[in-house]
């Protein structure tokens, strides 16, 4: 199979979207490289290159003899990630200038998770610090699957996003920081349920997610 110029980036983006938004793989499960090659019409070379890139982004892990795996996720892991995310966003809100302006309405066509990630990306951009932008983008990627679980667990998910966006659009820095902290505290209380959901376990299932 001959890979045309640009195939590597196309395969990377396709695999990333698939693994974050479409795949039913659970934490700790193995990535099937031949299946990805068939799915995206690419040879194993760009597929493996894309997977190594995702390992670098901490969206996958690679272990000798086991290949590529969906990262295992424990409650402390997810708690740390939520706390890292709120620290980044509160810092961004504290140092934000007025640009780019944030509309009180999410971009047309965005789903609930995309609308939230768009808001957080815009808050990071307003900090004027490219490292904050990269860090928030990376945290959003790693939190994408947990946010899919949040949609099932938080009926007011979209209302929360609209409230945060409204505060950001109004330029209420103090109120926005307080709302961001409160939002993430609610998520921290849900960590056990989110981790169980990602492992395919119900609240009544006596099994514990693998450590």
Where do the PLM segments sit?
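Amphipathic, non-membrane alpha-helical segments in soluble helical-bundle scaffolds
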Residues: 5, 44-48, 75-82, 129, ...
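All-alpha effector-binding/dimerization core of bacterial HTH-type transcriptional repressors
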Residues: 71-128, 166-178
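Hydrophobic, amphipathic alpha-helical faces that serve as interaction scaffolds
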Residues: 84-95, 117-158, 189-192
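Long, contiguous secondary-structure blocks with strong helical propensity
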Residues: 2-12, 114-121, 144
């Amino acid at each position: 199979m001959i890979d045309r110029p640009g195939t590597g980036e196309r395969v990377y983006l396709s695999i990333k979207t698939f693994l974050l938004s479409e795949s039913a793989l659970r934490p700790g499960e193995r990535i099937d490289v031949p299946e990805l090659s068939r799915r995206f019409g690419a040879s194993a070379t760009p597929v493996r290159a894309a997977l190594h890139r995702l390992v670098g982004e901490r969206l996958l892990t690679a272990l000798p003899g086991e290949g590529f795996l969906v990262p295992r996720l424990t409650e402390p892991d997810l708690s740390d990630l939520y706390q890292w995310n709120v620290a980044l966003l509160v810092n961004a809100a504290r140092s934000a200038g007025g640009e780019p302006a944030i509309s009180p309405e999410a971009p047309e066509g965005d789903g609930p998770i995309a609308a939230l990630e768009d808001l957080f990306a815009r808050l990071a951009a307003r900090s004027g610090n490219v490292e904050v932008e990269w860090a928030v983008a990376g945290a959003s990627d790693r939190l994408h699957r947990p946010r899919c679980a949040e949609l099932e667990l938080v009926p007011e998910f979209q209302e929360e996003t609209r409230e945060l966006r409204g505060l950001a659009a109004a330029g209420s820095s103090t109120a926005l920081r307080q709302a961001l902290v409160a939002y993430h505290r609610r998520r921290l209380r849900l960590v056990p349920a989110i981790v169980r959901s990602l492992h395919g376990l119900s609240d009544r299932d006596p099994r514990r997610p693998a450590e």
